[in-house]
Every structure is written in C-alpha cells, then in structure tokens.
Amino acid sequence: MRSHFHGRFSAICRLFVALTLSPLILVPTEGAAQQQSNSGQYSMQEIVDAGHSFFGSTSGGLAKVIEAAFQKYGLPNGYILGQEGSGAFIAGLTYGEGQLNTKNAGEHPLYWQGPSLGIDYGGQGTRVMMLVYDLPSTDAIYARFGGVSGQAFVVAGFGMTLLKNDNVLVVPIRTGVGARLGLNVGYLKVTPDPTWNPF
C-alpha cells in the first residue's frame, strides 16, 4: 500500500514539475522565434543612428519624425539614404540618387524620378532618408510609388510623407533649405540606373 502511495506521489510530483517548467521552456523558444522573424528589420535606434550620421548637424528633430513613422508603420526592413533636388511653382520634377540598405541583402545603389504636382512654393535641395516597409526582395524597390504628400516642415526642419506600391511602403523623411508647403500629388519612380525620364 505504501509503495502504491509512493508511486502515485512520485507521479504527481513529476506532473507538477512538468507543468511548472513547461512555460519556462516555451518562453525562450517563442522569444527566439520572434527575434528571428525581426532579424531582417531595423530597430528605431538603428534608424536614428543612421539618420544622425547622415543628416549631421541639422538632425535635431529627426528622432521625433522617426518615432512618428515607427508608431504608424512599425519596423522597416530597409532604408534609403540619398539626395534629391526639385523645385516647382505649380508643377515640377524630382530627381534623386541614393543607396538601399538591407540587413539580409546588402546595399544597392538606386535612382528616383517623378513629377511633383500641386501647390508647391520654393526650391528644394534635400537630403532624404526613406524607410522601406514590407519589401519582399530588392528588385521590388524598382517600381512606381505613388501617394499624396502634404509637406510642412513642422518638426525642426523635417517632413515625412508616404508613398505606396502594392504592399510595399516607402516613407521619405526630408530636410532642406527649401520650403514646400501644400499638397503634392505625384509619384516617385525608382530605377537601378539614372534616367532623366520621370515617366
């Protein structure tokens, strides 16, 4: 009788230990899976650091703009650093060149062009950082990204807009000496080689 009781007690103890330890065993696995799924994405600190070194002394309000982008769109899996120039009174053109940076597929030079239509004032020579979301492959960046951008440099000289192609989002963050206020309805065409044709 005693050995039967002892056997049941041992079984209950083993069950208790198994139930107690199983969540502890599962937690690291779940955390590792989550870390693995985010391994191709950039943290906010990584983007802020890249932006500060790129924009230099003008980067005072950059962290606030990046924080707003992360709150709206989450973690990007790529970012572009480059320069563009455009100027318009009612209609104009935008040209730029830069580099796509990814964690899993390296760095890729690229160019962008596009019309800028709407109520634009002034000229613009701008450094630009673009956050890239849901990019399935580097080839998917070579496309037309359209959107409505209301640019007002309200955070220490930085403006943020949104462009989209299918599920891929591009969020340009710009700074520059020009002031372009109003509604800019246009698109950016991203190409692997330079071209003067924005269409």
Feature-to-residue mapping (PLM):
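N-terminal secretory signal peptides that target proteins for export/translocation
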Residues: 1-10
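Residues at the start of alpha-helices and the adjacent loop-to-helix junctions
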Residues: 10, 23-25, 43, 74
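Sec/Tat signal peptide C-region and signal peptidase I cleavage site
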Residues: 26-34
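Bacterial N-terminal signal peptides
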Residues: 13-27
